[in-house]
Every structure is written in C-alpha cells, then in structure tokens.
Design a protein with these regions (language model features):
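Short alpha-helix boundary/capping segments
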Residues: 72-76, 116-119, 232-235
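ATP-binding N-lobe of GHMP and related small-molecule kinases
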Residues: 1-112, 126-151, 328-331, 341-357
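Gly/Ser-rich oxyanion-binding loop with an adjacent helix/lid
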Residues: 90-201
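Charged/polar, low-hydrophobicity segments characteristic of intrinsically disordered regions
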Residues: 83-87, 166-175, 241-246, 250
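Short acidic-hydrophobic sequence patches enriched in Asp/Glu that either
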Residues: 77-80, 120, 146, 150-153, ...
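C-terminal nucleotide
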Residues: 1-32, 36, 195-357
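Short beta-strand scaffold segments in enzyme catalytic cores
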Residues: 22-25, 44, 51-55, 165-168, ...
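Short capping/connector residues at structural and topological boundaries
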Residues: 31-32, 47-51, 113, 119, ...
Length: 357
C-alpha cells in the first residue's frame, strides 16, 4: 500500500462491457457470504448491448465519488454505487485515497429485458480493476490480486455490485457458481466454459422482443429472497446443477435439440418459481405467451434452430443461429412485432468480451 499512496496522480480509464443472457438461470442466493449463488448459471454475452463507463480517480476530496449518467446527474443511481463501493472498500484499500468520477451510459434503454446492472457494474468493475493494476505497477494488466488474474478480479468485483454482472467478462459462455462440469468454476467469480462451442451452436444471435418496457413488478433482490423459504428451492437448485452439466455437453457436442430443451425449460422454471413463491408473481403477459407459441409453431414448421428464453419479466429473448438471419428476421417482422409494445425490439450478436475505450 505504501507504493500506492506514493502515486497520487490522476488516473482515468474506460471500458465498454456487454450485458448477458443466462441460459441456465441464477435465481437464489446462499445465506452466507456476499452475493453468492445458490446454483451455478451459464450465459452468453450480448456484445451489441452494452454499457460504456469511464472512471477518473483523483486525489481524495471530501466525497468518495461523483456519478453522472451520460454527463448528467442521476441521484437515483447513487445509493447502489455507494453500497457497492462500501462493500469492496475492505478489499480495495486504495479507494480511501481517491475520489472517483464515474460516468456511464447504456446503448439500450432501461426496462427492455436487458440486464442493465450487469453491463453497468461490469464496466465499472473493469475500470476499478484496471486502475488497481496501474497502482500496483502492472501496466500490462498481468498482475494477480488475491490469486485472481485481471478478468477474474473484474468478475469478482462486479459480482458484489450485481450477481449477473460477473458473467459479462468473457467471449466464451460464462459460468458462475461451483459445478463439477466446469473446471475452476467458483461462486466468487465467473469463468469461461472451458470447452469449444460446436459450430452448430456458435454464432447465435439474440432478438429481444419488448412486450413491456415498464419497471419490473419485483426487483431482482426481492425475487432472489423469495427462494429462501420456497418449497421447491432445493429441487430447483439441484435441477440447475444438472442442466448446467447437460448444456455444457450440448454446446460441446452440437446437440441443438438438447440445447433448446434446456434453455426453454430453464426460462419456464424461473417463472414457475416466481408463481409458486409467497408472495407470488406472474411476470409474463398474454403477449409473452403469444410470442412463445409463435416461436414454437415456426420452429415446428421450418425446423430452424431457434429457442426462447426469459428474464424475470415479460420480454422474450429469441435465440437463433446467425446463419439463418434473414429468414428469422423476416419471421420477427411479419409475425412477432405486432405483440411488442410499439413494435420495439433489440438485436445482438453473442460471444463478445469487454473492450477498453
């Protein structure tokens, strides 16, 4: 720390971090530790839907941080950032010497079924980990902190801000949570799946069909808490372990049928857990179900490789083989957009990692 305190220059860094969509869902936290998952999850990065964040670390003033959203003050975001910085302060002692000037912007609107907190905390944590490396004298980002490399450290920090954020660090499918199916997997940070994705399941794309662009009726934090006394929680956690092992095998072997079954089943299990908790919630809307039925019908008629997944809300993610882009997008425009609010949708490729900006 003496080395760090001697270096009181202004440091500035920026990252663009993608959001991600979980295939096997993270839903429920362990009762011990900070933001540790009750089951492992796996996700694909959404490289075209991202947060861009810059952090300038200046010698400490009377405030710990100043936050702006696209250059404008956003007081409603400050409590989450303050809580995050307070939680990591013990692990990042250098923070006490600096004031952070944070500016962030998403290239997608809030309330669209995209994990904005994943992209936002992912980008912020990358900036923090980068500054940490510079303060330690590792300009090439090749230092290790508590045994973690730069990407693991970024994932570790982002997990404390938003659990799903820790899966936004990799171009490969990212696994968060201990699993016998993935070497090196951890509850503390995400790792790459570790095996090559078969050609039949690589290069897939995601169309986010926006059924409802309002605020979610239940926050992620409250939703996770519902699992604490849920009658089906243990069965769900066990099934997630099983599904993670199965989907890793499916992606490795190119078993598209198995991949589709697991992804869609996981989406429905997530909503089933919400509908059978106390209090209970129905987060799907009639148009959510209409879109799902249209996807099933089109897949049955054409045999095209595609499936849906859901977050904890009404919007639908349509995952499909990017090689079938024209056919699928014609289907989206002709059959699905009429079910979307103001015909809104977003598109992204999968499989891109964060970049320095």
């Amino acid at each position: 720390m003496d080395h760090i305190k001697q270096q009181m220059e202004i440091l500035e860094v920026g990252y663009r971090c993608p959001s991600n969509i979980a295939l096997v869902k993270y839903w429920g936290k362990k009762s011990t530790g900070v933001q540790l998952p009750a089951n492992p999850s796996i996700s694909l990065s959404l490289g075209d839907l991202y947060a861009s964040t810059t952090v300038k670390a200046s010698p400490r003033t009377d405030v710990a941080f100043v936050f702006t959203l696209a250059g404008a003050s956003k007081p409603s975001f400050e409590p989450k950032i303050e809580a995050f910085l307070n939680k990591i302060a013990v692990d990042c002692a250098w923070l006490s010497d600096y004031t952070l000037y944070i500016d962030s912007v998403n290239n997608f609107p809030h309330g669209t079924g995209i994990a904005s907190s994943a992209a936002g905390f992912g980008a912020l944590s990358l900036c923090m980990a980068h500054i940490e490396q510079l303060l330690m004298g590792y300009a090439a980002l090749d230092g290790r902190v508590n045994g973690m490399d730069f990407w693991q450290r970024s994932s570790y920090l982002s997990r404390i801000g938003s659990g799903s954020a820790c899966r936004s660090m990799y171009s490969q499918p990212a696994v968060w949570g201990e699993s016998d199916a993935v070497a090196g997997s951890s509850d503390l940070y995400a790792v790459e799946m570790g095996v090559a994705v078969h050609a039949d399941l690589s290069g897939w794309k995601d169309v986010v069909l926006i059924v409802d662009d309002g605020e979610k009726s239940v926050s992620s934090t409250a939703g996770h808490a519902l699992l604490e006394n849920h009658p089906y929680a243990l069965a769900r956690f066990g099934k997630a372990q099983e599904n993670l092992a199965s989907i890793v095998g499916a992606m490795r072997d190119g078993n598209v049928k198995s991949f589709i079954e697991i992804v869609e089943s996981e989406a429905l299990q997530l909503h089933a857990m919400m509908m059978t908790s106390l209090p209970y919630y129905v987060l799907m809307r009639p148009n959510t179900l209409a879109i799902i039925e249209k996807i099933w019908q089109f897949r049955e008629e054409t045999g095209l490789p595609m499936c849906f997944t859901l977050d904890a809300g009404a919007n639908v993610h349509l995952l499909y083989d990017g090689k079938k882009d024209e056919t699928v997008m014609n289907f989206v425009h002709n059959e699905l957009l009429s079910y979307c609010k103001n015909r809104q949708y977003l598109c992204s490729e999968t499989g891109k990692r964060p970049v320095l900006i």
